[in-house]
Design a protein with these regions (language model features):
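Mid-domain alpha/beta scaffold segments of enzyme catalytic cores
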Residues: 1-271
């Protein structure tokens, strides 16, 4: 079984064929898909998707790319929503949250304030975090050290080995996906090959970050089987071993997956 720890399955790119996309994921061997929210207006959507589909889990949060549009009461609404769903069997934690120092025109002070409040919230309720760390790993790590949420995932990580080790030491797993499939992504591929096996999880970030064989087309969770095969080749492991270790890692850092049973075992295909 494979777990896609980061997929925006609620995105409009899937509106015309979402059911088929989910079916294809199951046929490819996926037993769980984690769908993080990005702003207040899709909180209902990701929760409803998780409640409708037996292999979908959800997270709630405010993504750094959308904080300029966040309302003054969004953080309080997030707190109230988290209090309401913290015992929901499909709720994995707070995400997607973090900092983005790459996209121009964002209010960095606003990003920082919103991120800090969400990390504090995760720590208060003992919830994992799903992190956006683009060009911002050190600043994100600083807040993790300060508030100490119990676990989480650094999604689409592309920092240094030292930065990765700091995150791992704080209970985070490191997410690898489509970017790893490009030969030119040397840093990401080195990280995937060399970081501790217990730190690795898989993701698609679909419909974004398409793997090499799909780029520039739409990504989808079914591609995770071939992404897992790339990781297996980089580490000199079998596909089955990679599936087993990344699934165990995902369930460790997102305990709701383990507590509610992240899908039934399935054959892993690469078609």
């Amino acid at each position: 079984m494979l777990i896609d720890t980061h997929c925006h399955l609620d995105a409009p790119e899937f509106d015309e064929d979402r059911d088929a996309v989910i079916t294809a994921a199951r046929q490819a061997g996926l037993g769980a898909i984690v769908v993080p929210a990005v702003f207040r207006r899709n909180w209902d959507t990701v929760q409803a998707l998780a409640e409708r589909e037996p292999d979908v889990w959800f997270a709630l949060g405010l993504h750094p790319l959308y904080v300029n549009d966040a309302g003054p009461d969004d953080l309080e609404h997030l707190r109230q929503r988290v209090m309401a769903v913290r015992d929901h069997p499909r709720f994995v934690g707070i995400g997607e949250i973090g900092l983005d120092y790459f996209v121009p025109g964002l209010d960095l002070a606003r990003q920082q304030a919103v991120f800090e409040a969400q990390v504090r919230l995760a720590a208060e309720f003992g919830l994992p975090v799903i992190l956006h760390t683009r060009r911002s790993v050190d600043a994100v790590t600083k807040q993790l050290r300060r508030f100490r949420p119990p676990s989480g995932i650094a999604h689409a990580f592309n920092g240094s080995p030292q930065q990765a080790q700091h995150l791992i030491g704080l209970g985070m797993a490191i997410g690898f996906g489509g970017a790893m499939t490009f030969d030119r992504a040397r840093n990401i591929r080195r990280l995937a090959a060399s970081l501790p096996a217990e730190s690795l999880v898989l993701e698609t970030d679909a419909p974004d970050i398409s793997p090499a064989w799909v780029h520039p087309g739409r990504n989808q969770p079914a591609e995770l089987a071939r992404i897992a095969q790339v990781l297996a080749e980089l580490r000199g492991l079998s596909l089955e071993a990679v599936a087993e270790l990344t699934t165990a890692n995902a369930a460790r850092v997102l305990p709701a997956l383990r507590l509610t049973g992240a899908g039934a075992p399935a054959n892993i295909g690469s078609d």
